[in-house]
Amino acid sequence: PDALQQLLQADAELDGQYGWLSSRALAPDGKDQPMNLQRSTPYKDLASFAGPRQPAVMASFVSLFLRSSTVQHFGLPIAEFFIWSDDWEYTRRISRSMPCYVIPASRVVHAMQNATVVNIATDTPDRWPRYRYFYRNDVVLYRREGLRGWLWLIAKDAWHSVQVLRHGPQ
């Protein structure tokens, strides 16, 4: 019930000198929501929720706190990204220029119909066309990371291809 209060307290402590603040998103059973884990690098989920704040570079829009001046400076999320990676692109755009943080004491419950990590190999066939946007958006997002981003994309897409071949419909 005090998630917003925790974000406002962090805002005051940081004197507005940050890009965004993010809450810890939990499932109704109290476990972390895998789809809403923040990233400490573009390639690695946040390892710990210890301490008053954890630096992060990407976050979900679930309980994301931004100052209006940040939105005015960086603009809005890319509208065409809607469905997948719009939040990661936007938060990464901001974190390239400003420090950003997860505030572990700020906790929200995010009930989702499907709380698993996105995986084309295990998803239902009626959702497969949506993955076009997932992969397109990832290319835009990770190419901004230079050579390492391209290598990440190649490795991730190769892994997804192997999963589809192993687990996809026969």
Where are the regions that the model predicts?
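Short aromatic-enriched loop/helix-cap "lid" or pocket-rim segments at secondary-structure transitions
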Residues: 31-37, 113-116
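A short, conserved alpha-helix in the catalytic core of glycosyltransferases
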Residues: 64, 69-75, 80-106
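Active-site donor/metal-binding and catalytic loop motifs
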Residues: 103-123
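Conserved donor NDP-sugar-binding/catalytic core segment of glycosyltransferases
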Residues: 2-35
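A recurrent flexible, glycine/aromatic-enriched loop bordering the glycosyltransferase active site
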Residues: 46-66
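Short, hinge-like loop/turn segments at secondary-structure boundaries
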Residues: 36-42, 118-121
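Non-catalytic, C-terminal membrane-associated alpha-helical segments of glycosyltransferases
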Residues: 129, 133, 146-170
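Alpha-helical elements of Rossmann-like donor-binding domains used by nucleotide-donor carbohydrate transfer enzymes
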Residues: 2, 6-9, 89-93, 137-140, ...
